[in-house]
Amino acid sequence: MLRIDIVTIFPEMFKGPFDVSILKKAQDKGLVEIKVYNLRDFTEDKHRTVDDYPYGGGSGMVMKPEPIFKAVRSLKKEDSEVILLSPSGDLFNQKIAEELSKKNHLILICGRYEGVDERVKSIITREISIGDYVLTGGEIPAMVIVDAVVRLVPGVLGDPDSLREESFQWGILEYPQYTHPRDFEGMKVPDILLSGNHERIRRWRRKEALKKTFLKRPDLLEKTSLTQEDLELLEEIKKELREEV
């Protein structure tokens, strides 16, 4: 079972997201245990202070080291992965999600204000960012990471095929999806999906996935392993796009 402990000054933010859908089912099945801790419970002064002014001056407040150290020390085990959600961390992606899903215990520390005291870095194992933009705190990044990681835990998703076919699972974007009706306001489902020819459908889906990736996220093609068929399909795609111009 994967255990995830989240340390935050706003525990109420996590009440909704973890009580519905796949995250709730994963907990109900006993595959994942998620607990949220209020950082203020690890303070020792009557005001439950978690932040203070920065040395050297500057705007904003900085999260104090003492409560974070105390929280981590009370929760940490030998095999714990202690993660600080930080703009300066490694950019979160599917590969990191897969790595974390294989861990036994994750501790997520949600930063706030102008950041955390630099000395906190001495007790964490990695820093993670979810993107190059500014957020109010680490709570939303923590939710993103938990959602991405939990769905990869064996047994969480009912259909293993859905996990294998998802975007990024094979390093590229997913092929287009269609459902009923067959014709909606003149927009029709591609005939090949109605052909019943599984090999042609498979090839069409792979080609469409490669095309979408080539047009929207070409950087992904440089990072993934492509088969000979993929390379041939990409040449077809490039030729077709040139002919459209």
Swiss-Prot record:
Its EC number is 2.1.1.228. S-adenosyl-L-methionine binds at residues 111, 130-135. It holds the Pfam family tRNA_m1G_MT. GO terms for molecular function: tRNA (guanine(37)-N1)-methyltransferase activity. The keyword DNA repair does not apply. Keywords: Cytoplasm, Methyltransferase, S-adenosyl-L-methionine, Transferase, tRNA processing. GO terms for biological process: tRNA N1-guanine methylation. InterPro entries: Alpha/beta_knot_MTases (IPR029028), tRNA_m1G_MeTrfase_C_sf (IPR023148), tRNA_m1G_MeTrfase_TrmD (IPR002649), tRNA_m1G_MTases_N (IPR029026), tRNA_MeTrfase_TRMD/TRM10 (IPR016009). The keyword Methyltransferase applies. It is found in: Cytoplasm. One of its GO terms (cellular component) is cytosol. It catalyses: guanosine(37) in tRNA + S-adenosyl-L-methionine = N(1)-methylguanosine(37) in tRNA + S-adenosyl-L-homocysteine + H(+). It is an enzyme of class 2 (transferase). Specifically methylates guanosine-37 in various tRNAs. Homodimer. Belongs to the RNA methyltransferase TrmD family. This is tRNA (guanine-N(1)-)-methyltransferase.
